[in-house]
Amino acid sequence: DFSKFERGYKKLDFPAANGNFIFYTIADLNKRKNLQAFIKAFHAEFDPSEPVSLLIKSSKYGLPPEETAMKIKDMCNHIKRGLRKFPDVNDYKEDLIVTDFISEEEICRIHRTCDCFVMPSYGEAWCIPAFDAMGFGNTPICTNIGGMSDFIGDAGFLIEGMMEPVHGMIDTLPDLFTANESWCSVSVQGLMDCMRHAYENRDGLKSMKKTGLKRAYDYSHKNIGNLIKDLLNADN
């Protein structure tokens, strides 16, 4: 439904982020999504005095929202302690964590509220949230892997990484996501650099946002259907 990109959505109210530039992600809570890289890059790059915020919308199958929120908060605090920039984790910028099960309209409100989408995952087939963020004009910053490499192009930032054996995917089928496979570990420094650039060059990203909306429409059912029809006709 591409019309959602053009609808008016009321922005959500996050008092701690009032007036801030918000980096955000929408992702399941699992190892493949690599939320740790996003959290580390944000708090390593930005000082608490800067008007920027981090928002994580996440959920985990079979886990109540409040437990999911606690797991993410513990993850954030563990990373902050490891960064050792400040003596207390409370000295860092407050993280915005949303774990309630919400409607598609509420997801669209998150896109409309935030400014720059970040997906540092180890691998993606497509990544619907990144595609939708691009359609909403929220310049995506993503690992250069999978479907994101195809649809983002020059409408966002694709960060290189290193291929390494899969590790830590314990909540899946026994024959999937083993060390016999490889995935891409994104450069945290690359994330930091692109997040800084997006924050400091908002006016310069306007053309990129327009490109993102155009590229989103390139993948409409109609356009893809016509492409498939042309390919089938070419074989006749």
Q: How would you describe each model-predicted region?
A:
Residues 122:
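Aromatic "clamp/platform" in nucleotide-sugar-dependent glycosyltransferases that forms part
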